[in-house]
Amino acid sequence: MPTPKKGARLGGSASHQKKILANLASQLIEHEAIKTTDAKAKLLRPYVEKLITKAKGGSVADRRNVAKFITNKEIVAKLFNELAPKFENREGGYTRIIKLENRKGDNAPMSQISLVLEETVSAEATRAARAAASKKAEEPAEAVEAEAPAADEAEEK
């Protein structure tokens, strides 16, 4: 017999927590960014990342597995048709959590969880950009040094 998760749960019962996560995931996929409490955002991140990984597969079985958790067909269609192709080259890390100010009413710590839709830059590309920038910075310095002796010779004459 499976034992329930230890510790605090969102909403009290395990079934309520599942519903909360399903609703938050639906809203995140629909709006691509939502504002929620830190605890909910931290629990939502792996939940959504697993759904996106399944959506990248694109098979009918994957679509049915995702539909078990997200019941709105329009949101499932958006996940498979719009979002999954954007994450084709990314191997995880589909979401980002940004800490916000505490909520005014009860001082609860708040966060914004959003989908990372920007293209990733490889380490090689950043190295190449840094090398190009350093070469560009060295060229003006060498040009100034070359001009300085010529100016000194002109002053002596």
UniProtKB/Swiss-Prot annotation:
The keyword Nuclease does not apply. Signal peptide: none annotated. Keywords: Ribonucleoprotein, Ribosomal protein. Residues 127-157 are annotated as: Disordered. GO terms for molecular function: structural constituent of ribosome. The keyword Transmembrane does not apply. One of its GO terms (biological process) is translation. This is Large ribosomal subunit protein bL17. GO terms for cellular component: cytosolic large ribosomal subunit. Belongs to the bacterial ribosomal protein bL17 family. InterPro entries: Ribosomal_bL17, Ribosomal_bL17_CS, Ribosomal_bL17_sf. Part of the 50S ribosomal subunit. Contacts protein L32. Residues 140-157 have a biased composition (Acidic residues).
